[in-house]
Amino acid sequence: MDKQSASGEIPAMRWEPYHRRDPRNAKELSKTTSRGYFLDHLEDFDSQFFGISPKEAEQMDPQQRISLEVAWEALEDAGIPAKGLSGSDTAVFWGVNSDDYSKLVLEDLPNIEAWMGIGTAYCGIPNRISYHLNLMGPSTAVDAACASSLVAIHHGVQAIQLGESKIAIVGGVNALCGPGLTRVLDKAGAISSEGFCRSFDDEAKGYGRGEGAAAIILKNLSRAINDKDRILAVIKGSAVAQDGKTNGIMAPNAKAQQLVAQNALAVGNIDPLTVRYVEAHATSTPLGDPTEISAIAAVYGVGRDSQDPCFIGSIKPNIGHLEAGAGAMGFIKATLAIRKGILPPQANLNKLNSRIDWDKAGVKVVQEATKWPETDTIRRASICSYGYGGTVSHAVIEQFLPLSGLESLQTQSPDGPGVLLLSGPQQKRLSVQAETLRKWIAQDGRNHDLSSVLTTLATRRDHHDYRAAMVVESHDDAETALEALAKGADHPLVAQGRVLGTDIRKDVVWVFSGHGAQWTDMGKELLNNPVFYRAIQPLDELVQAEIGLSPIEMLLTGDFDSSDRVQILTYIMQIGISAVLKSNGVFPQAIIGHSVGEIAASVVAGALTPAEGALIVTRRAALYRRVMGQGGMILVNLPASQVEQELGQREDLVVAIESSPSSCVVAGDRDVVAQAAESFKERGVKTFTVKTDIAFHSPTLNGLIDPMLEALAEDLAPSTPTVRLFSTSLVDPRGQDLRDIHYWTNNMVNRVRLTSAVNAAVEEGYRIFLEVSSHPVVTHSINETLMDGGLEDFAVIPTLLRQKPTEKHILYSIAQLHCRGAEVDWKAQLPGPWADGLPTTTWMHKPIWRKIESAPLHTGLTHDVEKHTLLGQRIGIAGTNTTVYTTRLDNDTKPFPGSHPLHGTEIVPAAGLINTFMKGTGGRRLQNVVLRVPVAINAPRSVQVVVQEDQVKIMSRLLSDTPQATEDDSSWATHTTAYWARDIQEAVDPIDIAAVKKRLGTRIRDDFSINYLDQVGVSAMGFPWAITEHYHKDKEMIARVDVNPAVTGDAPLPWDSSSWAPILDAATSVGSTVFGTPALRMPAQIDRVDIFTSQDPPKIGWLYVEDASDAAPTSHVSVLNEAGEVVAKFTAMRFSEIEGTPGVSGSMESLVHQLAWPPATPAEEPLSIDTVLLVSSDAATMRQYANTIPRGVRSFEFSSVQDLISQDKSGLRLDKGTAVAYIPGEVQSLEEIPAASESFTWEVLELVKYIVKGGLPLKAFILTSNVGSGETPTALAQAPLFGLARIIASEHPDLGCLIDSENPVFPLTAMRYIQGADVIRINDDVARTARLRSLPRNKLHPASQPPRLLPRSEGTYLITGGLGVLGLETADFLVENGARRLILISRRALPPRRTWDAAPSDLQPTLAKIRNLESRGATVHILPLDISHPAAATQLSTALDTLSLPPVLGVVHAAGVLDNQLILETTRDAFTRVLAPKIAGALALHAVFPPNTLDFFLLFSSCGNLFGFPGQASYGAGNAFLDTLATHRARLGDAAVAVQWTSWRGMGMGASTEFINAELESKGITDVTRDEAFGAWLHLARYDIDHGVVLRSLAFDEGEPLPVSILTDIAVRRVGVAAAGDVPGTAAAGGADAIPSSGPELKVYLDEKIRGCVAKVLQMGAEDVDSKAALADLGVDSVMTVSLRRQLQQTLKVKVPSTLTWSHPTVSHLVGWFAEKVGK
């Protein structure tokens, strides 16, 4: 309204990455328009509000972030609680056109992460809104350039009109994160160099780009009226079109703009002359504005009187051109103009555009704020929006005029106090929200009726988990209460709390307490409440008729000191209070009555009428007069059981009430009670006197039973309760006895069992208790009971407090209920109109912006990796003889082509450092080369090569992740030093290669050095050299080397041919293998390195090595050309031995393992098992086991799991100490195996579900019969249970395990003493558990025999799963190793070859692979066959006969299906679908190719069944069968091998993803590359074994618990890493981080540690982690869950099961779990 313009300079941070990315950018950026309409803090986002981790938020386009916030604000402004839309068909259509952030982050290739895809996609903007609000309607991004958001509105209208959605959230967004499009628009002349929009102005020369977001909520008009919504305007019509072929695709078309406007008017049947205002697109371009005005004039200006123009305007000069968001912004401006009846003035307008004939146009620019003409019977406006690609859109809106009498629908709220609600997803938000609302109420809020404000907050806003509710009666009250909340001060009527946990029942138990709540004025104020009065008035008449006393009069006068009157008024008050609670929207879901309170409880539960309740209490009170003054009661702080034992059989003093586990009420004769009180006090036991002179619930009242039976004999007709009703008069609180006369005599004389009733409610899940009374009587007792049960998350709330305002305190109790998550029908309490204009959510923003780590590196600034040096930018130091080369080194710039790991970390080979020195100095001799510290590439580092006179050295420092870090933050390390000389004077004699070969005599294997290095842990070479001849004797060797065998003939090398590094790397490597004892050695010092030629090094040469060891391993290595001339030489190259670390180095020795079964370690404390439930369909085998169960252990037998379940339902006791033993039956033939295996596994799954879902305290064991031997069909059929058991142990770690025995002897000892195992094998009567170990040397395949597992050119090789990724890679490997005929079996057929070129794109990689195989000389046959089909063996045999190929010599079974499901969610169909290809498929192959008919039979299994990957029960079971089938065939002499693979990086069903990598890491292992996998195959080929486990172990800190015990023997420990106290179960003595042993201190400690782990994973502050919030709501996704498990395990030194965060979804839950584990 003030003609303000928001144009300004672009924030500096926006373009900063582009300055760094390329030096040329600076020049371009200096020419790019830097002014526009920018948000000051685009990077700010409240990620916590939406449960998005900062890590994920950083990967989200800011457009997604601000759209989320704006959409939320729009819903709040519309009075539509977002959570109420969950699961609805609500649509989201969002205009979006900018992908600046996407370009920014996705062009930073080394740092791309998984969530960046959806995080930067256009669709991610509406989809993110739909996802976070759980909306199920259409969710679409609309890209129509600058028309996008008005088109989105059009789509929203259509979705509602077509019935797709009832509500649509529509809008648009624009964010300018990069300079690219601005540069484009600069060159196109579309934007103004001054960064302003000057719509309609004569000086308009382009627009100023703007950013922001707009959201609009759409509803069908009739629905909005019915829902009592605030309707801002009505969309009468909208239209979208294209402007066709114009002078250019970006040129506007007036005719098209005119037609789309006419279409929109026609949709709404609107006369254009009734439209008073048009919000124009008005991009301020010389061509665009006149064109658009001509179109507007043609539609809206024709027929207009000059005094009655159509006004036009545009919001762009105020906020800029928001491009994709522009239409929505214009729509909002037009809507507000209609609503307020004022036309806003145009900004940045000095002189009207002279190219437009304004006098004839019939339209007029609004130059000053103008009141909407009153001549308009209804205000109407139109909005134009056009895209530069030709999209034209138009909408017509009008004023909403309420229907006559509509206001009468708005019921006015009652006067008096009400409840003001606030909430937030985190506790810290409440004070911020409170202060925001307080300021509003102090100013604008004064213009609103307070009840409408309360209604808005209660019924039109979302209620988050952290809540505050305050009872207020005026604006001043509200201000005071909000100020207290904002400042954290106490206020008697401000309730705060967190909703009970997500898995906790929120239903409320109303507890009606007994005698003792009375106080003088307890009902006086409530009598003014019409609801209260109406509820008790009929009862007042009844009581008067019975005893001549008026309860209402007694409440008014306070005359009710006697016990009989108190009894009556207790009932009356409870009935009245109940009515008031219900009128305020609070209802009970369960009820407990205590003493006389049971009467009102029964009435409210529907078991009695109010009149019946009044008769009971009145007539019983009359009888009480007979015993008044004779008795007494005291509350004693001792358990009822103890007091009862002390009292013995006394009748004059008894336990009358079991109040809580630690207190009770004693009743009896007056004097006896007084004496007892004194006695208890003398013992130091606290007692409290109950204000009564009657010994309720004691034998004193036995004399009243018959009179009471007589008094009520004909007057009660009890009903079945309609609300869950717990009894305190019956021994069983769940007893459903009718509340008849006998019940009430029992209620009078029997003990009150409050503790039992409360515990029964707790057992049924109730955690919220509301005491309905005039003052809390049992609240404390209920609290004690709940705390005694170990509960922490619960609420016990009183309704009234003595001497406190009753009306407000009932509301305060409701406020407290709401804060704990109880359901309150606020519309019942606040039925009136709601207010608009209340503040929306106050965002707690934090800057979140992706730091662009890498930038393209340019010549001269870094080293040339093809030259194999670290020589980067050369800097001469003025006035010195010093030259410095600087560069950056990381994985992308390593100066060697291969891999050179040491202990799992890539390092620059020594040859690369020497090459660097030679090239950097220009010298040909190095002396005293000292290799101090390897140059590691594990993290980016800055490297300097310093040449200072005759010295040279290499130094580096790590590059800090912190932008503010200075060079001093990371000290420089010196890696290598040397002295250099330019010329060599001495000559060197050639070496007679033939003579040396003859002298040595013995030619050894060409791969001797490679195998030697592989054996000691060197997994790969930095350069691809190969030895082609090798001779060795004693301390000499000579070897012919080819630095790149893949390059043949005259083809150029793939690097700079002048580099000496490749051949010198061969020299240092071969030179370390001359020593007799293999060890991992590195060059440490070299006396001299000489280069004797100025020519390039030879591609093929010879290495002459001499062992020159003295104190240390030392060698001389001469590099010869083919003529024997010495071209280079290492003199006295000394090596230092490095401690090997298998598993980290990556050698084949460390990648390939076998499964061993060493004896298990027994536990010190045995598991208690006194009862065994045997389950088996094989009665004979079950009887064998049963006969060996030791005496003293009970046993029961069941024919199936279903039999056990049915017996349980009929009353079988299943206590702690009971174990279920499932015994799969025997199988006689191979044909029975598939059905039997499926039956066995499914029975076990049913057993697990039965135990876990039922929460039964049982252990479960699976007892198999010698599966480990693989000898029999029984062993094969039971084998899948091995894999299944490991998955069960992973998902439910405390359940039990599988025990495999050679004989059917019941393994009770193993059950009791071998704890924490998943599979136990009993061999030679010794219990054993699995461990991974190195392959046994005694199993090496004799070198004299043909190699195993490799193809021969004359054979045929068959691969199942042949068209899968692994199948095709296997085919490639076999062809690479000589196979020439392949049969690829797949369930899918390929199209005819003639159609391959036209095949779908997703099939082309497969076809290309096959063509490649054929181009290399292989014949490939595709056999479409389901190998798991029952007839597969026959079909395969027939197909082989038809093909008439040479014999099949090798089979690879790589077929498989993966369908991950947690055990509790597994279905039989899904389980079988995965199991069949593994079992039936393997058996079909076994039948077609019996043992000893092939060269090899290779089965692709998985290490997942050894490590227990959660969700892979079916997959693990199937792979366990393959493992045993390999054993079975091997026992028969067959070359069968099962390979238990880890994940192949980027390939197959286990293709490495962020989630799979995290899951592997959580188990302590990692994936392998394709080359490593086939290297493992070749390594396995050297051994005669039936299985190999291929994986790489991670390194663990000393003292860190292993995630799985199977790694015990191969795990690598980082020695010396652990600090004092890091050993499991210990802490540094007296250290600051010592773990408390138990109690509250332990829980505080664990809460801090666990929140720290969560914060680390989420990349947020620990203070922002809410202990009671669901981890998923904090932003922990499936990938982060795995990372979190490892963090917890490392921090707390406790093994963490894979499903822990699923079953314990909050930090508080985790604290409880870890407290139990750490406590042990």
Swiss-Prot record:
Residues 1001-1144 are annotated as: C-terminal hotdog fold. The active site is at residues 146, 281, 321, 900, 1065. One of its GO terms (molecular function) is 6-methylsalicylic acid synthase activity. Pathway: Mycotoxin biosynthesis; patulin biosynthesis. The keyword Cytoplasm applies. Patulin was originally used as an antibiotic and specifically trialed to be used against the common cold, but it is no longer used for that purpose since it has been shown to induce immunological, neurological and gastrointestinal effects. Genotoxic effects of patulin with dose-dependent increase in DNA strand breaks in brain, liver and kidneys have been detected in mice. However, more recently, it has been proposed that patulin might also have anti-tumor properties. It catalyses: 3 malonyl-CoA + acetyl-CoA + NADPH + 3 H(+) = 6-methylsalicylate + 3 CO2 + NADP(+) + 4 CoA + H2O. Residues 868-1139 are annotated as: Dehydratase (DH) domain. GO terms for cellular component: cytosol. The keyword Phosphoprotein applies. InterPro entries: Ac_transferase_dom_sf, ACP-like_sf, Acyl_transferase_dom, Acyl_Trfase/lysoPLipase, Ketoacyl_synth_AS, Ketoacyl_synth_C, Ketoacyl_synth_N, Malonyl_transacylase_ACP-bd. Residues 868-1144 form the PKS/mFAS DH domain. Residues 509-823 are annotated as: Malonyl-CoA:ACP transacylase (MAT) domain. Keywords: Cytoplasm, Multifunctional enzyme, NADP, Phosphopantetheine, Phosphoprotein, Transferase. Residues 1-31 are annotated as: Disordered. 6-methylsalicylic acid synthase; part of the gene cluster that mediates the biosynthesis of patulin, an acetate-derived tetraketide mycotoxin produced by several fungal species that shows antimicrobial properties against several bacteria. PatK catalyzes the first step of the pathway which is the synthesis of 6-methylsalicylic acid via condensation of 1 acetate and 3 malonate units. The pathway begins with the synthesis of 6-methylsalicylic acid by the polyketide synthase (PKS) patK via condensation of acetate and malonate units. This is 6-methylcalicylic acide synthase.
